[in-house]
Amino acid sequence: MYGVIFHFLREYVIERHGGKATWDALLKAQGYKYKMYFPVQDYADEEIVNLVQTASKALNVPVPDVLEDFGSFVGPQLLTFYHMYVKDKNMKTFDVIEVAGGSIHDAIHQHNKNRKPPRLSAHREAPDVLMVHYQSHRKLCPVVRGIIRGLGEKFNEKFDIKETQCMYDGADECVMRVTKLL
């Protein structure tokens, strides 16, 4: 897992769930007295899975809900981190999601050929409907839903997100129909 995600997870826990003491408690539960995550380094997927599961138990919130809330937090953060791909100031949520599926994930893979970023693609079915396709061995579709919601909050847009197929139900990929609400 790309280190920037751990960085964002730390910021998420600190901002939304009790501050640095909560983050330190999560690390301690994983057997770390102190741990620093570097944005461009790779870490084992299991490490973030364990952190999220520990957070879920501590917060008494189901893992998918923690992941979706994390996604809503991280969506706007990703705009800042990958600002070079989102140069058009008139871009809105659908535009950003369309760009993310190509340029951003290509850039992640280009820096390290061993990285396995998710496959993400999106196309407009209508001006107010975006079809989002997500595939990853990590099965983090709740994060994708959250990112869409978080970007929507940033751009003052609201969406109805219907998952028409999901990897958790045996599908090869998750497909989300995202409808912009007026």
Residue ranges and their predicted role:
Residues 6, 10, 14, 71, ...:
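Generic solvent-exposed, charged/amphipathic alpha-helical segments
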Residues 22-31, 67-73, 88, 160-168:
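Short alpha-helical "patches" and their helix-cap loops
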Residues 16, 29, 58, 154-155:
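Alpha-helical structural context
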Residues 1-34:
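Charged, compositionally biased N-terminal leader segments and the immediate start
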Residues 1, 5, 62, 139-147:
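Short amphipathic alpha-helical segments
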Residues 21-59:
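Long amphipathic alpha-helical segments
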Residues 48-142, 165:
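Amphipathic interaction/junction segments at domain boundaries or subunit interfaces
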Residues 129-182:
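C-terminal non-catalytic interaction appendages of large macromolecular assemblies
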